[in-house]
Amino acid sequence: MKNFENKVAAITGAGSGIGQQLAIQLAKQGTHLALSDVNEQGLAETLNHVKDYPVSVTLTKLDVSDRKAVEDWAKQCEQDFGQVNLVFNNAGVALASTVEGLSYEDAEWIFNINFWGVVYGTKAFLPYLKQSGSGHIVNISSLFGLTAQPTQSAYNATKFAVRGFTEALRQELDLENCGVSATCVHPGGIRTNIANSARMSDSIRALGMNPERASRSFNKMLKTPPDVAAQAILKAVKKDERRVLIGTDAKIIDLVQRITPTGYTQAMSFLTGKKRRK
């Protein structure tokens, strides 16, 4: 997709962070917007940022873990705009817990949003993207979809799942030659609210970690501004890239994993232990 003018983009998690910046930058390029988020106040803030651009915008309060709600939203988008060209499955949450301490409730919570939300969004919009004749799906994984880390088993699992799902989807779309493509995004630490909304289990104390300190450390890792991330994503869509790594941290982690696919886990354990002793 060479340009976004007069295209229609559906974005989940559009009330803050990367989703909000995608909306702003697409509006600047003349893209009509179907924005959704579970946070209505955040959506209102995003609308305030894009309202002066000559594009149509709809706002929908949406829980991406609700399949019917996502399907209804996709239908409404097609009815409102007559077409959908871009889908950004961006909504996500974080969770820190040991495997032993991970509750089934928390595991289902994070999978329902991070993985099933992506599946629902992809499947609900795919027929409309094909109808448009020129479509693109962008699914947000993570650098934790490239490597695993202690206390991140559930989060890792969801992001590895998004990666596998999207890479398989891209191959199928290539074989179909249907005019629709897909990109998997692996952001490093992006300066968003994900750390503040993350669930922190006391079980990580068994590894010598303090939940409050872990949350502060997580926040310090968030270096890349969301507008920079959004720019990289849109550039990747225009170039039809299969995968995009965002941030120096994601690029370094990816390189280390390629060089030593199993050895990196020992290094990660060492670094985690070193941090907890500080």
Predicted regions and their residues:
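Conserved glycine-rich cofactor-binding loop
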Residues: V8, G15-G17
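Conserved glycine-rich Rossmann-like NAD(P)H-binding loop of the short-chain dehydrogenase/reductase
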Residues: Q29-E45
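Active-site helix of classical SDR
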Residues: T122, T158
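Residue(s) in the substrate-gating loop at a strand-loop-helix junction
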Residues: S142
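SDR active-site lid
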Residues: D174-V244, T248
